[in-house]
From Swiss-Prot:
Organism whose genome encodes this protein: Oryctolagus cuniculus
Segments for region (Glycosaminoglycan-binding site): 173-193
GO function term, MF aspect, one: serine-type endopeptidase inhibitor activity
Signal peptide: 1-19
Glycan attachment sites: 32, 169, 368, 404
Name listed for the protein in its UniProt record: Heparin cofactor 2
Modified residues (Sulfotyrosine): 62, 75
Keywords: Blood coagulation, Glycoprotein, Hemostasis, Heparin-binding, Protease inhibitor, Repeat, Serine protease inhibitor, Signal, Sulfation
Sequence repeats mapped onto the chain: 56-66, 70-80
């Protein structure tokens, strides 16, 4: 009789309602979207956002950051020489980007580097005209959790792709646990209340009843990622219903049926949920929204709902990559970068060369001027199994029956699903999701109008931590 391997499943659910109260209220008032209360045993004290306080009743800061962030936790280290095993080019870029950055910012630089590579892997698997949407911080967090239980070559592959090894090699003061501690700090920095936006995250760890998980693994994911191991029966249809109700609650009723079915052989599931709602600093007047042409390619044009506003916006023109960059700010220190190639054919080059260095170059070369901005409304709903994309990036043993996950369980365990699901809505109210030099750049001094009428990239950053929250491509605004 052939032995069937134990399965590990990772599921990430992302909801980004970019500022839009329109549509959100309607959906929340929909009687078909009732959110039944969850039994106590289903969701224990396992996340920093477990207890949802009604809007308007939040404390100014529901976390005691003074205890969590000691004075020396986020200081600027002197960068030591990197390991000679690193390539000179890679080491130089890492050192250059790390200069003047806090530890959390350095971690997020490498998280973004991983995200851009993952984006390219997903793009290579998709149709050229497909929209793309991912939440890098959720993916990095889930992989960070799993890496706590990996050993040998399996561990090395994951750490290499996530660039954790580059981080450790950058300073003699850094070690692997430094990274996990920074993920803990990052969670507390990001998911706070009353910053003018809503950003929530939940990490859940479900374990099949009677399946033995190492106590040290459970302790570490609890300490660094706030995930308390919870017993579950994956063969019971009631589990899927309960999990979906939980996701429905976390995402304010906007993501339904996230889990359609679970393989009965699954022994462990990691569920990461992120919800974001932000409001533009410069809103788009609803009465200004109008039908406008959007060029899909050299031959096809579609009509889109084009929003329009006027105000002071940061923007730059990158002559090297032949694109325009606009920063749209949300209330509270989060912003969306809109990147539009000059030519329709320029998207491939832009996607291929997108790096943290390029983004930093854009941000440091922007000028603040009064501009008229035209941006299409869009809503993206994407669902990915990231396994093949991660394999193409070099993470192969994690999804192989011979992968070493002995730090999770003494019994054999393998992973065959890494689910990533997200939704982002952008409307008039907001969203409801190289060397520093001016060479090759020029201010948009003569361009009074910034019109987004062709496929574009978007990147959502939290500025204090330099965290890339969301990114994607809008190839066709009328499709999800």
């Amino acid at each position: 009789m052939q032995h069937r391997p134990h399965l590990l499943l990772i599921s990430l659910t992302i909801m980004s309602v970019c500022g839009g109260s329109n549509g959100l209220t309607d959906q929340l008032n929909n009687k078909n979207l009732t959110m039944p209360l969850l039994p106590i045993e289903f969701h224990k004290e396992n996340t920093v956002t477990n207890d949802w306080i009604p809007e308007g009743e939040e404390d100014d800061d529901y976390l005691d950051l003074e205890k969590l962030l000691s004075e020396d936790d986020d200081y600027i280290d002197i960068i030591d020489a990197v390991s000679p095993t690193d390539s000179e080019a890679s080491a130089g870029n890492i050192l250059q980007l790390f200069q003047g950055k806090s530890r959390i910012q350095r971690l997020n630089i490498l998280n973004a580097k991983f995200a851009f590579s993952l984006y390219r892997a997903l793009k290579d698997q998709a149709n050229a005209f497909d929209n793309i949407f991912i939440a890098p911080v959720g993916i990095s967090t889930a992989m960070g959790m799993i890496s706590l239980g990996l050993k040998g070559e399996t561990h090395e592959q994951v750490h290499s792709v996530l660039h954790f090894r580059d981080f450790v090699n950058a300073s003699s003061k850094y070690e692997i646990l430094t990274i996990h501690n920074l993920f803990r700090k990052l969670t507390h920095r990001l998911f706070r209340r009353n910053f003018g936006y809503t950003l929530r995250s939940v990490n859940d760890l479900y374990v099949q009843k009677q399946f033995p998980i190492r106590e040290d693994f459970k302790a570490k994911v609890r300490e660094y990622y706030f995930a308390e191991a919870q017993a579950a029966d994956f063969s019971d249809p009631a589990f899927i219903s309960k999990a979906n109700n939980h996701i429905l609650k976390v995402t304010k009723g906007l993501i339904k049926e996230a889990l359609e079915n679970v393989d009965p052989a699954t022994q462990m599931m990691i569920l990461n949920c992120i919800y974001f709602k932000g409001t533009w600093v410069n809103k788009f007047p609803v009465e200004m929204t109008h039908n406008h042409n959007f060029r899909l390619n050299e031959r096809e044009v579609v009509k889109v709902s084009m929003m329009q506003t006027k105000g002071n916006f940061l923007a730059a023109n990158d002559q090297e990559l032949a694109c325009d960059v606009l920063q749209l700010e949300y209330v509270g220190g989060i912003s969306m970068l809109i990147v539009v190639p000059h030519k329709l054919s320029g998207m491939k080059t832009l996607e291929a060369q997108l790096t943290p260095q390029v983004v930093e170059r854009w941000q440091k070369s922007m000028t603040n001027r009064t501009r008229e901005v035209l941006l299409p409304k869009f809503k993206l709903e994407k669902n990915y199994n990231l396994v093949e994309a991660l394999k193409s990036m070099g993470v192969t043993e994690l999804f192989d029956k011979n992968g070493n996950m002995s730090g999770i369980s003494d019994q054999g365990i393998t992973m065959d699903l890494f689910k990533h699901q997200g939704t982002i809505t952008v409307n008039e109210e907001g969203t409801q999701a190289a060397a520093v030099t001016t060479v090759g750049f020029m201010p948009l001094s003569t361009q009074v109008r910034f019109t987004v009428d062709r496929p574009f990239l978007f990147l959502v950053y939290e500025h204090r931590t330099s965290c890339l929250l969301f990114m994607g491509k809008v190839a066709n605004p009328v499709r999800s």
